Amino acid sequence: MKLESQFLSFLYSRGYCSQCTNISMLDQLMSQQCVHAYIGFDCTAKSLHVGSLIQVMILRHLQKFGHKPIILLGDGTTKIGDPSGKDKSRAMLSASEIEENALGIYEVLKKFIVFGDGPHDALLVRNAEWLNGLNYIEFLRDIGKHFSVNNMLTFDSVRLRLEREQNLSFLEFNYMLLQSYDFVELNRRYNCLLQIGGSDQWGNIVSGVELGRKLRLPELFGLTTNLLLTSSGEKMGKTAQGAVWLDGNMYSPVDYWQYFRNVKDEDVGRFLRLFTELSLNEIRNLELLQGHEINESKKILATEATRICHGEEIAQSVANDALKVFECNDDSGLSVFYVKKYDVELGLPIIKLLQMCEMEKSSSSARRLINDKGCKINDVVVLDMNYKLSLKDFYNTSYVKLSCGKKRHLKVMLESDF
């Protein structure tokens, strides 16, 4: 169908959307008025990572097309844990940990969208405002009566855990009710009509839409995004070294740029649509590049994604430094990792060094790297698993260049012992 709403047309043309409830009516509404829409994030970490970047970009586009983004921080629901897409229960967090995580997520989101009091400015809300004071008996009577356990057992978040005979606590089973109730409260308090989430949230979102109908609220809508997978079927946002955080203090802009520069050829066009603001015509032209030229598309993807997350100045600086390192053999822009001189004098095992500097996550992955001839010291391939970094490696130089594959490099420097 032809969409009238600029926002929905944009989302569908870029490949964001998976499913939507009553899309014809939602399209009509969004083409005629400013719609208040929300996306929720539980406070399980101090930052969001690339796995949440689709949702963050949608918030940015909502604002750009004249709608009002509402960000719901689940400081209340984090105390329970969402079972969607999870194989096991999450560890319980303390109130202080949840608060610290909420503040960190807010700082990340401020880089992507504008918060304020204007009609299209983003609004930050916490669901502890209404969940912490709930009376359990009243909640069961007024809200719980509208939910069928039979239906709840059919949703993937519940069904898959039960089929695998994995524990699903009663606490987690209640998460769907609380997320549905969040939608109702956001409508009552902030006139929110649309909830957006990942495809694994479809059951919870539809339950919220249905709860609104049973409580005779204005029609509510739900929209889910496609699951963010690479062409090889892996979830986005993780590397061998850990999560790709959107907080520059937890994952450096240099590494962020490199993450997108190193995506597979098959993913470049899709990621340009999802994670940059280049026009579709520009993206189509970049998709025409083949062979070695596709690296130019990857550099543009990396620089544009870094610009949105970390700012124009940092993105250009990182891109220029990368050009020096990888195309001009200039090591000046490499990150530095310090090792104690005493350890090097004794002989620092290469397996240990690779883990210390987080180039590899485990000794087994470090061994695989060496076995595949992917580890280099000063551009010389390391062939010996038992190789030890020594002072001889620092002869006539202030640093040792450590390389893992063609695209990961850093400078190892000596730190004086105190």
Curated annotation (Swiss-Prot):
It catalyses: tRNA(Tyr) + L-tyrosine + ATP = L-tyrosyl-tRNA(Tyr) + AMP + diphosphate + H(+). A motif ('HIGH' region) lies at residues 43-52. GO terms for cellular component: cytosol. InterPro entries: aa-tRNA-synth_Ic, Rossmann-like_a/b/a_fold, S4_RNA-bd_sf, Tyr-tRNA-ligase, Tyr-tRNA-ligase_bac-type, Tyr-tRNA-ligase_bac_1. NCBIfam families: tyrS. It holds the Pfam family tRNA-synt_1b. CDD domains: TyrRS_core. Residues 348-413 form the S4 RNA-binding domain. A motif ('KMSKS' region) lies at residues 235-239. ATP binds at residue 238. GO terms for molecular function: ATP binding; RNA binding; tyrosine-tRNA ligase activity. It comes from the Bacteria. PANTHER family: TYROSINE--TRNA LIGASE, MITOCHONDRIAL (PTHR11766:SF0), TYROSYL-TRNA SYNTHETASE (PTHR11766). Its EC number is 6.1.1.1. SUPFAM superfamilies: Alpha-L RNA-binding motif, Nucleotidylyl transferase. This is Tyrosine--tRNA ligase. PROSITE patterns: S4 (PS50889). GO terms for biological process: tyrosyl-tRNA aminoacylation. Homodimer. Catalyzes the attachment of tyrosine to tRNA(Tyr) in a two-step reaction: tyrosine is first activated by ATP to form Tyr-AMP and then transferred to the acceptor end of tRNA(Tyr). It is found in: Cytoplasm.
